[in-house]
Amino acid sequence: MSSGGAGIADMQVRFDGCPALSGLLRGAGCKKGNRMESRDDPVVIRHRELERYANAALKAGRIMMESGASVSVVHRGITMIARGFGVETIGMRSGYTSIAMTVHVADQTITRMLQVGRLGVNHRLDLAVRQLCARAEKGGMSVEEVEAELARLVRETPRHPAWFTAVAVGLACASFGRLLGVDWLAFGPVWLAGAIGQYLRHHLLHRGVNIFIVAGAIAFLSATLGGLGAIALQSATVQLAMMASILLLVPGVPSTNAQTDIMDGYPTIGSARAVWVLMIMLFAATGVWFAEELLGTRG
């Protein structure tokens, strides 16, 4: 059997006595012919080009959303890339876990959707992708170039080491604690408790542990460590020290984005972000409650 077409023809002759099978084989030959014709169909070719444009723009939007950008910023970046490819964006929809867009050129229209991963905060990567969107909007960049640049940015954008971030976060917790009224005796314990909590949170999240469980566990651990340190040093602000030790869990960027999205006319994802913030605070409060019960510091 030298080829698919020849093989079908041979089988049609061989099973001439079976009309049903002969019809089935003729149908298979027609389907193969249709597939070959579709490869050269200009409509199909243009459809695939639109699909590539949409996917490249959506990838940029997904990275921005996962890096902490608001919906309006994400939509603007996606539109800029699509415009650079010479297509018109006629519709976009963002959910908490997905983004979709519809692009149009001439008489061709296509809709595509990408799933969005865990939403975090990475302002360096967010800014780098925004700058790429601005370059792509000017034209002259192919789909391959845009996708390659996105991959490079994800791979090479500098990130602070986990230990450095932990030390900085711990210092921030202690500094905010001072503003809240924590005395100097509790400053060191709060710094240490916040740093340990941030370091463990970083590794737990990268291992895929549920973010709400992490919030509750880290709140309990950091509050307990901060409280024990304050008690050991005979601080007069033990409860404040325990509260300051968990300030690392306050979801500042998601809270701001929730308000921004609702005010910008995206109430669905804004409400989803707000519920997420409330859940984080609920689990954090539960962790602190258990820590206070353990140390006997509840009034």
Model-identified regions with their sequence ranges:
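Short hydrophobic transmembrane-like helices used for membrane targeting/insertion
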Residues: 1, 8-13
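Serine residues within intrinsically disordered or low-complexity segments
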Residues: 2-3, 22
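Soluble N-terminal domains of membrane-associated systems
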Residues: 11-141
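Alpha-helical transmembrane segments and their membrane-interface boundaries
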Residues: 107, 117-299
